[in-house]
Regions:
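Flexible, solvent-exposed loop/hinge segments and secondary-structure transition points
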Residues: 1-137
Length: 137
């Protein structure tokens, strides 16, 4: 019998967000953190106290991008520069694509079952916090 992949339900999404928040607190940064399921539907979102309002949509769109392409948003950045094969892609999908670090697909083995998106600090901090959340899966 074939095992079914895990699903990103609310409890799972909240566990991922809690792990991400723990890392954000270690880094002393306030983040916006969103988790989407396999259908790219928002399951949970948290804005830490003091997190930038302008980063709310960025965090959600990082999760959207990571799930839409099943790759980390940091992987898209070099491919989207002038002269590169995906230049201009960030203008597609109604402008929702984010091509800098902080979005990571969530996987059960090799199967992508959702994504996390984080925004609110430097891209290095965003990526580290997203990675901590993804590791909690």
């Amino acid at each position: 019998m074939h095992d079914m992949a895990k699903k990103i339900d609310l409890d799972t999404a909240l566990r991922i967000i809690d792990a991400a928040k723990k890392k954000a607190k270690e880094l002393k940064v306030a983040m916006n953190i969103g988790v989407v399921d396999e259908g790219n539907n928002l399951v949970a979102f948290e804005r830490m106290d003091g997190a930038w309002l302008g980063s709310i949509n960025i965090a959600m769109n990082k999760a959207y991008t990571a799930r839409a392409f099943n790759m980390e948003t940091k992987t898209l950045a070099p491919l989207c520069q002038p002269g590169q094969p995906l230049f201009g892609i960030h203008a597609s999908n109604d402008g929702r694509l984010i091509i800098f670090p902080g979005g990571i697909p969530l996987k059960d083995g090799d199967t992508v079952i959702g994504a996390i998106g984080v925004s609110g600090s430097s891209v290095e901090d965003d990526q580290a916090v997203a990675a901590a959340g993804a590791a909690a899966l």
